[in-house]
Amino acid sequence: NNPTTLLKSLDEKPKKNWLRKIYECEDEKALKFFLKDKNFENIQLIQENLSLLWECCQIPDFVKKTYGNHYEVIGNVYKFLSSSKGKITDDFMRLQLIKLDKLDGNVDSLSNRIANVRTWSYVSNKKNWVENQNYWIEKTKLLEDRLSDRLHEELTKTFIDKRASILARGLKQDMEFKT
């Protein structure tokens, strides 16, 4: 019903012996962050908004590098879902994916983009969270596939370059021994 009750219930030990409590899960940390944020004080008044915020806090952090960025994603999603429209707009989704639709870069940058696309894929797959849900599900899937193919190429190239370098060094040493 209220933030205090929700946090208390999250802190309880599981009733089943074979389950164990994991302290400070990512979604719980996110919820505590937003409950302390002055911009989100109004959620305490409406139970639906608190449930919605909790659901948004459960968006997985696939990137796992920058907490601020993940909290920004959660905050943006929550603001759209709690607005009068109640859904993330096509324009917002388009802007998020345009930033990620780049096939250049090294293994780390490609992996990071894939992780970010997975976040938006998760959001797209949540029922009634985005306008034109089927379109965005397909769009995120295609973008993730393209980035994954490019990552595979980059990994293969890196592996082959290292292997060729090792072989070349080995051949050079063999030639030095023979002369």
Go through the PLM ranges and name each one.
Residues 1-45, 51:
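C-terminal or mid-to-C-terminal helical accessory/interaction module adjacent to the motor/catalytic core
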Residues 36, 42-179:
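Extended, charged helical/alpha-beta scaffold domains that provide interaction surfaces
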